[in-house]
Structure formats: structure tokens, C-alpha cells
């Protein structure tokens, strides 16, 4: 599985209240949540990002409240994956559960800049910076996690397994 998109780079400790502000938590409609993703951090993100773009961030991405709305809003906005130095554990689990690919790649984060064109191969863990001509490595997903992501999340994966 590969994705390609432009990088949007942010710093450390981007918490779930910044990813999707609490004032929008009166809905769980992914399309509605997507309209407001990262709006307090970067008011232009939603209007300028294109489907397939990639969020790149520092340490502890997704810290704070353990709400599934945060990765859901990111995925519904059309972001193809998130690359960070590290993730809050509950965000990591919620992202996998809803089928949002995420990779921990500190070296990549140090080198990638906003606007760089990236290509990510999840099966190998390879991140290509097409703008700079550089290649970075992340640990690839284990097969069972890749299956969950390809299925669109844990619920869809479980439905497929139950059908046989």
C-alpha cells in the first residue's frame, strides 16, 4: 500500500483539542468533523490541503483527551497518513482502529518541510521525499495491522473476518 501527497508540518504536542476543537464534538459525522480539522492551529489547512496530503509532526502527536473524533476528522479530511516522531498511545490505537495509517519516523520528521512531496510505502516502511530526493525509514506495520488499515478500520476488518 502506497500513498503520495504534500507535507503539512507541525510541532510537538499537538493535542486532540487542537486536532478537532471540543466545540465541534456535538457530532460524530466524519464529514462535519473534517471541516474543522486543525482549524485552531492552522486556519488555512482545510482550505489548502488536497486529498492525499500528509501531516508531519513532532513528538507526542495526538496527546490529550482520548477521543476517536481526532483521527476520524483527519481521515475524513482526506489526509492519507500522519508521520510523527512519536504518538500518544491512545491516539495511535484510535488511528489504527479507524484505519488511519500512522508512522513513527523521527529522522524523516527532522528533514521534511511543509510543501515537500512525499511517497510512503507502508509495507516496507519507506518514506520518499520526492522534493529533496531523500529516503527515510520507519518500521513497517505488522501484517495484521496492515490488514486492519486496508479494511478501513477494525470494525470493517472484523466484519470481513466474520463473513469468512
Curated annotation (Swiss-Prot):
Pathway: Amino-acid biosynthesis; L-leucine biosynthesis; L-leucine from 3-methyl-2-oxobutanoate: step 2/4. One of its GO terms (molecular function) is 3-isopropylmalate dehydratase activity. InterPro entries: Aconitase/3IPM_dehydase_swvl, AconitaseA/IPMdHydase_ssu_swvl, IPMI_Swivel, LeuD, LeuD/DmdB_bac, LeuD_type2/HacB/DmdB. It is an enzyme of class 4 (lyase). Keywords: Amino-acid biosynthesis, Branched-chain amino acid biosynthesis, Leucine biosynthesis, Lyase. Its EC number is 4.2.1.33. It catalyses: (2R,3S)-3-isopropylmalate = (2S)-2-isopropylmalate. CDD domains: IPMI_Swivel. The keyword Lyase applies. Belongs to the LeuD family. LeuD type 2 subfamily. Heterodimer of LeuC and LeuD. PANTHER family: 3-ISOPROPYLMALATE DEHYDRATASE SMALL SUBUNIT 1, 3-ISOPROPYLMALATE DEHYDRATASE SMALL SUBUNIT 2-RELATED-RELATED. This is 3-isopropylmalate dehydratase small subunit 1. It comes from Pyrococcus abyssi (strain GE5 / Orsay). The lineage of its organism: Archaea, Methanobacteriati, Methanobacteriota, Thermococci, Thermococcales. The gene is leuD1.
Amino acid at each position: 500500500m502506497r500513498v503520495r501527497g504534500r507535507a503539512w508540518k507541525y510541532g510537538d504536542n499537538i493535542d486532540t483539542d487542537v486536532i478537532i476543537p471540543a466545540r465541534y464534538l456535538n457530532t460524530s459525522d466524519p464529514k462535519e468533523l473534517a471541516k474543522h480539522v486543525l482549524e485552531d492551529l492552522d486556519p488555512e489547512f482545510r482550505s489548502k490541503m488536497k486529498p492525499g496530503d500528509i501531516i508531519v509532526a513532532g513528538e507526542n502527536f495526538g496527546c490529550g483527551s482520548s477521543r476517536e473524533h481526532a483521527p476520524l476528522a483527519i481521515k475524513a479530511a482526506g489526509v492519507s497518513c500522519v508521520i510523527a516522531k512519536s504518538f500518544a498511545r491512545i491516539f495511535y490505537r484510535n488511528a489504527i482502529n479507524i484505519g488511519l495509517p500512522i508512522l513513527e519516523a523521527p529522522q524523516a520528521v527532522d528533514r521534511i518541510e511543509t510543501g515537500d512531496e512525499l511517497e510512503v510505502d507502508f509495507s516496507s516502511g519507506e518514506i520518499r521525499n520526492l522534493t529533496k530526493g531523500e529516503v527515510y525509514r520507519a518500521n513497517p506495520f505488522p501484517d495484521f495491522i496492515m490488514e486492519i488499515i486496508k479494511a478501513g478500520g477494525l470494525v470493517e476488518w472484523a466484519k470481513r473476518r466474520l463473513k469468512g
